[in-house]
């Protein structure tokens, strides 16, 4: 062998390549030593730091891509990154003080501001406060009069008291106390026939304690409980609710697209659960089928003579409906249903929302009902 043949030169691997990460480990090590030169920094500290930053960046990009897809955009914009951070609770806490350039702001519209809008169909609700009592000359003259001028209370008969109590009873019965604790009503709007549409914010784990007469459960043809809404209902209702769903599956399953079936809500605060087979986004006439699904849910609630019903957001799980499109179709179907019907047992329709993006979309779309 000749002495000229030496060892092959090995290409140097960077610390990032050896650790299996993309972010520069050596640069992070220099930054850590620069600011904290007093402390001893281990070799694995910048590797762990690079891995965490890389994971957070990938998570934000994935959520931003979902937001761009829901808004029917081909590219990710700073607005989508802002929505991605706002929709994730942990990322929102981590990046609370971070300002994203050209990201815009999240809508936070108070119900009082929405109630002042004027429109043809919507009826603004104003709370009338009693006028303050006037202290005039009568009070002064009463003091001068001494003991003789005593304040006399107007006598009310028993019949008038009974009438007042009856009026209070009827008003309380028509206007319900609300969906219960843990549910915040953000805004509301009244339609022509008196039906009240309310945007309600809560956590998905509280859906079992919502005090309404009917809850809509978007599902598949097999009436399974594999999606988020179904899992939350199963967790709240327990074995009793699961057995009720199994009996419904045997008697009325499988459901056709846009078909609705009603079951008892065992273990839940609501009286009934309306299971509906929602269409898949991208299928033929999917928007028309979703509109038909919502109308069938309302008809099923009216058949049971329910007074209140709650709709969760329809872009759930595997159907991949864009949030903007689903909100537009939902409000259009509900408004058309009550316009076509001369009378209805339903008085309150709640939209149960869980994330800030859906709230902003529904606030925007409900405001458009005034201009129609």
Curated annotation (Swiss-Prot):
This is Core histone macro-H2A.2. One of its GO terms (molecular function) is RNA polymerase II transcription regulatory region sequence-specific DNA binding. The gene is Macroh2a2. Keywords: Chromatin regulator, Chromosome, DNA-binding, Isopeptide bond, Nucleosome core, Nucleus, Ubl conjugation. GO terms for cellular component: Barr body; nucleoplasm; nucleosome. The modification N6-lactoyllysine is found at residues 7, 9. The keyword DNA-binding applies. It comes from the Eukaryota. Disulfide bonds: none annotated. It is found in: Nucleus; Chromosome. Residues 184-370 form the Macro domain. GO terms for biological process: brain development; establishment of protein localization to chromatin; negative regulation of gene expression, epigenetic; negative regulation of transcription by RNA polymerase II; negative regulation of transcription of nucleolar large rRNA by RNA polymerase I; nucleosome assembly; positive regulation of keratinocyte differentiation; sex-chromosome dosage compensation. There is a cross-link at residue 239 (Glycyl lysine isopeptide (Lys-Gly) (interchain with G-Cter in SUMO2)). Residues 114-182 are annotated as: Disordered. The keyword Glycoprotein does not apply. Its main location: nucleus. InterPro entries: Core_histone_macro-H2A, Histone-fold, Histone_H2A, Histone_H2A/H2B/H3, Histone_H2A_C, Macro_dom, Macro_dom-like, Macro_H2A. Variant histone H2A which replaces conventional H2A in a subset of nucleosomes where it represses transcription. Nucleosomes wrap and compact DNA into chromatin, limiting DNA accessibility to the cellular machineries which require DNA as a template. Histones thereby play a central role in transcription regulation, DNA repair, DNA replication and chromosomal stability. DNA accessibility is regulated via a complex set of post-translational modifications of histones, also called histone code, and nucleosome remodeling. May be involved in stable X chromosome inactivation.
